[in-house]
């Protein structure tokens, strides 16, 4: 049996919602824990303003990958106000449709399509702020209403970086210079086309950002206090609903964040760097709380010293762990991660960036062009968030900086 298109699946989901007595108000596209947390925060904010919304959640995680969230994690699912669809399972997306987005902005309504009555309030297309949704999502959303508004949700650090630079990294994975050149040309041409489409959509459809910062440009973006407030409310709500004590005491601890970038970097280089970082944490008189990346294969995890606490529970995000804690960590060390950014903005927890150390080791070990480009991008990213992430250029500085932060904590 063939899998239906997204538009067909969305129309069926609308009929399902209407059968339960709800009007569809939004179509959401995302795949991560942060996406769902941000969606829940936005839905809670709207409910506080007296607008309780119902809608369709499209989990567009890649085929074969484990979903990062459950349907019941979404606000309103237990009340029957949410229908969840998964790409490759409940629907398929016509990828090239993005190129035809201009013609979709005012699409004809097919005779088999149910047009949502937008006389009372708008219909929302909600997506992560890293790029833009595929044209098929626009087609599905526009089949519901001409009165369309877009909500771009927080994607973490990726929200503030160029998606083109990320795509270029994958081109560098090609060993053949010819294939690499062809892929680079293809990506650059596609980036120009998408930028043109972005301009069209931004002029035709109102877009509202709901993320850590109010703007994406500049070296010192303004914090969105509304987002911070509602995300913290979400953390507290989830904690109270769990009915168990999830709090940890992070006093005297430094959180070290694992990574899952074995496509670009030799894991032995990362492991060696982490072991040196752990030694520096100990030299500062502090303890390491190691958080492996949820997507990091267990076979890649290096042998840790016995005094290092390892958190191997991916059901809670780092941000949730910190929110629930009875005492906050001294610092968060990593490669310009979202947890460092949110930790700094939400709770004033210092971030320590070690991307320069990684880049130096990659160059010393004659890492490939993809590894060098990858680490260069990390270094540039850390530099952009210098207000929240202290970029370290020598391993010895880590213990010095940590001692300074620990002394501030004691005051």
List the predicted regions and their residue ranges:
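Active-site and donor-binding regions of nucleotide-sugar-utilizing enzymes
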Residues: 25-191, 339-341
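Conserved catalytic-core segment of nucleotide-activated headgroup transferases in glycan assembly
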Residues: 231-298
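Short, charged, surface-exposed secondary-structure boundary motifs
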Residues: 64-69, 92-95, 160-165, 317-324, ...
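Donor nucleotide-activated moiety binding/catalytic core segment of transferases
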Residues: 294-344
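Short glycine/proline-centered loop/turn elements that form peptide/ligand docking sites
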Residues: 336-342, 350-365
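A nucleotide-sugar donor-handling region in carbohydrate enzymes
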Residues: 154-255
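Leloir-type glycosyltransferase catalytic cores
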Residues: 364-411
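N-terminal beta-strand-loop-alpha-helix module at the start
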Residues: 4-49, 253-258, 268-282, 286
């Amino acid at each position: 049996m063939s899998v239906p298109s997204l538009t067909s699946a969305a129309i069926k989901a609308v009929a399902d919602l209407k059968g339960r007595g709800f009007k569809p108000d939004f179509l959401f596209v995302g795949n991560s824990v942060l996406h769902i947390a941000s969606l829940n925060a936005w839905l809670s904010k709207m409910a506080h303003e007296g607008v309780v919304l119902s809608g369709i959640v499209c989990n567009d995680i890649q085929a074969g990958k484990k979903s990062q969230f459950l349907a019941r994690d979404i606000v309103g699912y237990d009340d029957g106000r949410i229908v969840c669809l998964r790409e490759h399972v409940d629907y398929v997306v016509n990828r090239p449709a993005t190129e035809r987005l201009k013609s979709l902005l005012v699409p004809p309504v097919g005779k088999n399509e149910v047009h949502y009555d937008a006389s009372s309030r708008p219909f929302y297309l909600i997506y992560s702020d890293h790029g833009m949704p595929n044209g098929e999502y626009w087609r599905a959303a526009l089949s519901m209403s001409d009165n369309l508004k877009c909500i771009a949700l927080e994607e973490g650090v990726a929200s503030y970086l160029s998606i083109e630079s990320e795509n270029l990294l994958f081109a560098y994975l090609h060993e053949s210079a010819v294939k690499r050149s062809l892929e680079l040309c293809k990506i650059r041409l596609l980036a120009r086309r998408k930028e043109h489409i972005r301009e069209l959509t931004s002029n035709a459809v109102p877009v509202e950002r709901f993320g850590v910062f109010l703007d994406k440009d500049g070296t010192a973006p303004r914090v969105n206090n509304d987002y911070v407030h509602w995300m913290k409310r979400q953390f507290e709500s989830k904690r109270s609903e769990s009915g168990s004590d999830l709090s940890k005491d992070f006093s005297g601890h430094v959180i070290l964040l694992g990574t899952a970038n074995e496509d670009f970097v030799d894991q032995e280089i990362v492991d060696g760097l982490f072991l040196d970082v752990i030694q520096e944490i100990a030299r500062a008189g502090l303890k390491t709380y190691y958080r492996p990346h949820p997507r990091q294969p267990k076979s890649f995890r290096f042998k840790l010293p016995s005094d290092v606490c390892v958190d191997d529970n991916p059901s809670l995000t780092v941000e949730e762990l910190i929110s629930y804690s009875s005492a906050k960590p001294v610092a968060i060390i990593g490669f310009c991660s979202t947890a460092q950014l949110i930790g700094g903005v939400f709770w004033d927890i210092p971030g320590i960036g070690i991307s320069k150390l990684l880049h130096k080791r990659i160059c010393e070990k004659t890492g490939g062009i993809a590894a060098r480009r990858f680490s260069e991008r990390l270094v540039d990213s850390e530099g952009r968030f210098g207000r929240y992430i202290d970029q370290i250029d020598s391993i010895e500085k880590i213990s010095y900086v940590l001692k300074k932060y620990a002394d501030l904590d004691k005051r």
